[in-house]
Design a protein with these regions (language model features):
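Conserved helix-loop functional segments at active or binding sites
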Residues: 2-10, 16, 36-43
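Flexible, glycine-rich loop/tail regions that form catalytic "lids" or insertion modules at the edges
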Residues: 1-2, 7-10, 61-62, 72-77, ...
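Alpha-helix-loop-beta-strand connector modules within alpha/beta enzyme cores
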Residues: 23-51, 101-108
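Conserved, mostly hydrophobic/aromatic
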Residues: 15, 34, 65, 121
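Short, ordered loop/turn segments at secondary-structure junctions
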Residues: 16-18, 54, 70, 77-82
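Structural preference for beta-strand elements that scaffold enzyme active sites
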Residues: 10-12, 46-50, 72
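Glycine- and other small-residue-rich loops at beta-strand/loop junctions that grip anionic moieties
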Residues: 16, 23, 51-54, 114-117
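Catalytic cores of alpha/beta
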Residues: 55-69
């Protein structure tokens, strides 16, 4: 705060120079916490938050950072991956043009996100916090995402720190390939997907054959799958008629 009052206008928050024995903080949480601290000090408009992070890889992640106060985002890891893909021959063409294409994709994705909220300029989206937290405790919300709804509460700083520690430990495993995870695409023994290959294959079989037993197999897979969404926690009161 004293540096900003002295005339400095750029604050760079970076997770680039991480080391093996340190656990990096989540860039979104850090951005939100610093943003709200500057607001509380009455100097937020006197400084710009530059976020240099490997966390931001798609337009949604960039939108979240900007929505919680980032002035601009530099996704260094995404650019490093692009350079590596070009160098290894997996991505053809000029590396600079590949970066430009990636940036263009981010821009279009951001515009789509903004337009859904009726916003046409990034300055109107910055710090708007047009989000609702799912699964974050009050202590996290009050420090990092003040004013955001978190109806079901959830993970504490200790929980989130444990997750970060796992990621940090995996990042520094020697001679081990990077774990791609299963967030976007089904990967065996990774994150659960409600529409996994077993469910889809059984649905196709039931539709193509028209056999009731095949349909029952599909229905049993759907009805017995673990809780993966909030709506899966709801249950209809079928024993009480409303008539």
């Amino acid at each position: 705060a004293s540096s900003i009052r002295a005339g400095h206008t750029l604050i760079v928050l970076s997770d680039k120079n991480i080391v093996a024995d340190k656990v990096p903080a989540n860039a979104i949480m850090v951005t939100g916490a610093v943003h709200h601290y500057l607001i509380a000090q009455g100097i937020r408009t006197d400084a710009n938050l530059i976020i240099e992070t490997g966390l931001a890889r798609d337009s949604h992640q960039v939108a979240v950072l900007i929505g919680f106060g980032a002035t601009c985002v530099y996704p260094y890891l995404a650019y490093d991956v692009i350079d590596d893909l070009v160098a290894s021959g997996e991505l053809l063409g000029d590396p600079i043009q590949a970066r430009v294409n990636f940036r263009k994709g981010l821009d279009k994705g951001l515009l789509k996100i903004l337009s859904k909220m009726g916003i046409s300029t990034i300055v109107s989206y910055r710090g708007a916090q047009l989000f609702e937290a799912v699964g974050l405790s009050e202590e996290v919300v009050n420090l990092c995402f003040k004013g955001v709804q978190s109806r079901i509460k959830g993970a504490t700083f200790a929980d989130l720190a444990a997750d970060q520690a796992i990621l940090a430990a995996n990042a520094f495993k020697r001679r081990a390939p990077l774990d791609q995870g299963g967030l976007l695409k089904f990967v065996f023994n990774k994150e659960y997907h409600a529409f996994n290959p077993d469910v889809i294959n059984s649905l196709h079989t039931a539709v193509r054959t028209g056999d009731y037993d095949n349909y029952r197999h599909y229905a049993d897979l759907v009805n017995s799958r673990p809780v993966a969404t909030l709506r899966a926690l709801l249950q209809l009161k079928t024993d009480n008629s409303i008539d």
